[in-house]
Curated annotation (Swiss-Prot):
Active-site residue list: C45
GO molecular function, one term: peptide-methionine (S)-S-oxide reductase activity
Pfam families: PMSR
Name this protein carries in UniProt: Peptide methionine sulfoxide reductase MsrA 2
Coiled coil, from the record: none
InterPro entries hit by this protein: Met_Sox_Rdtase_MsrA_dom, Met_Sox_Rdtase_MsrA_sf
GO biological process terms held by the UniProt record: protein modification process
Upper taxonomic lineage: Bacteria, Bacillati, Cyanobacteriota, Cyanophyceae, Synechococcales
PANTHER family linked to this entry: PEPTIDE METHIONINE SULFOXIDE REDUCTASE, PEPTIDE METHIONINE SULFOXIDE REDUCTASE MSRA 2
Amino acid sequence: MGLAIAVGSFLISPFSKVIPDPVVDINPVSTTARGTEKAVFAGGCFWGLEAMFEEVRGVKDVQTGYSGGTEATANYARVSGGGTDHAESIEIVYDPAQVSYGELLKIFFSVGHDPTQVNRQGVDQGRQYRSAIFATTPEQKQVAQAYIDQLEESQAFDQAIATEVNDFDAFYPAEDYHQDFVQRNPAHPYVLVHDLPKLRKFRQQYSDKLKAQS
């Protein structure tokens, strides 16, 4: 991750957009019989995405990792060097009876990252930081592409959406020190500048989607 440190009182404003609900979504009746489902997203540094989706009601687990590459293995050193074409990704295990795939997509596009940036997110540059959706089922691919088309037609963003929609191939969990990074390192400079503002914006915009506080 690139370290963009706050200078003086300057802080990076987190990306956020108010966008419409997906018109097309997966019927929960068709998925609940299978139990939990998985969604795999890539949108810049995976630390903040993981922390954000862990707070969504109906999400059971989130892991950071790597998807979408050309090699049958992945680790941070190889991925960050651009040698495998994997993207920093998160794997979300969720209960479709509590949160739909379309709802996860809306959060991903509106607060999770800026989907108009090509092969980067802010200070983080390279294919490993691209915007991508790795559909684990044909239904997910259909819903994701339909939502992108809907957002484009409604001109929800000032620029074209750069998000790639690909069939899921594999997910390689990231190293242990990358798991729950924001929770374990709240004072890390990158977290302070980029991830905590994103979390605050998410909590404000989606207060009705948060897990109950224990």
